[in-house]
Amino acid sequence: MEPITIPTDRDGVAYLYGHPLRNSLSPPLHQTVYNALGLNWTQIPLSTATGTSFTRSPEISTFLSSVRSNPKFVGSSVTMPWKVAIMPHLDDLTEDARQAGACNTIYLRKEDDGKTQYVGTNTDCIGIREALLQGSPNGAEHFKGKPALIVGGGGTARTAIYVLRKWLGVSKIYIVNRDAKEVEAILAEDKQRNPSPQVALVPVSDPSAAATLEAPVAVVSGIPNYPPQTEEEIRARETLRVFLNRQTHEKDQGVILEMCYHPLPWTDIAQIAQDARWKVILGSEALIWQGLEQARLWTGKDVVSEPGLVEKVQAFVAQTIAERSKSNL
């Protein structure tokens, strides 16, 4: 376990809390923002990774005790394995964190009585939302009243469901996943959080069923880039393929957000979608927008409106991913 560093040469410090932290873009992304804003801040990862070994990040009690007594602390990114476990230990949670079922960001909120609240939120919601809105041909209108599709059964799927419902106004959400139990868990959790949802979740596990349903206009894929091997994986991939190929007969071009961008930004699913004439949005776009939302919460500045800042962050991320793709890190 790495000690929690408080840098003496910086005015503010954010942390990246989790493990293993291999090739994370978060610290350099935030440094790009801080430099552009003229802030003497930094973000420090709380674990290290080399080869196949890594150091563990501190336990939650140790971490929170340290940051609560750190006058330079401005906020923290939170990643696995702490995104769910940390939630009950914080002073408050935003609706985004509660509905997504995970916290990826801690920020400070001053109360009227002068006390500081340590608040958990989920900026992945903003990342997915902005990636879809910025990448769609006509903004939110592209999605309203039309079906969307989620690929996967993990945290990304849960977050995407919330985003599609809250901000994009879709009519229904199909779920395609290899593991039926994961889908059942999503449905059970959703029923508990939203007893009377306006937008239904529709599991689809068979290509023939996909062929009879209204074609989606948006897809969020949140699975690793591995070739399907098992019968369930092959069926799920073929179900997705049927959905994607149907959109060529629709008036509007579909958009797909491929959240997997490591180790390579272009995945098998991205290629299938492009071949079916979908517009592919790389997952790095969601990374950028969620990072900018973190920076807004930590700095208190409207970072997106800062001239040239978004472009600097986009250029940095694009260059870094391109370099890593060449070396296949």
Curated annotation (Swiss-Prot):
Pfam families for the chain: Shikimate_dh_N (PF08501)
Annotated coiled-coil segments of the chain: none
Keywords of the record: NAD, Oxidoreductase, Quinate metabolism
GO BP annotations, alphabetical order: 3,4-dihydroxybenzoate biosynthetic process; chorismate biosynthetic process; quinate catabolic process; shikimate metabolic process
Enzyme Commission (EC) number: 1.1.1.24
Biological or metabolic pathway of the protein: Aromatic compound metabolism; 3,4-dihydroxybenzoate biosynthesis; 3-dehydroquinate from D-quinate (NAD(+) route): step 1/1
Matches recorded under InterPro entries: Aminoacid_DH-like_N_sf, NAD(P)-bd_dom_sf, Shikimate_DH-bd_N, Shikimate_DH_fam
GO molecular function terms noted in the UniProt entry: quinate 3-dehydrogenase (NAD+) activity; shikimate 3-dehydrogenase (NADP+) activity
Catalytic activity: L-quinate + NAD(+) = 3-dehydroquinate + NADH + H(+)
Xref: Gene3D superfamilies: Leucine Dehydrogenase, chain A, domain 1 (3.40.50.10860), NAD(P)-binding Rossmann-like Domain (3.40.50.720)
Entry protein name: Quinate dehydrogenase
Organism whose genome encodes this protein: Emericella nidulans (strain FGSC A4 / ATCC 38163 / CBS 112.46 / NRRL 194 / M139)
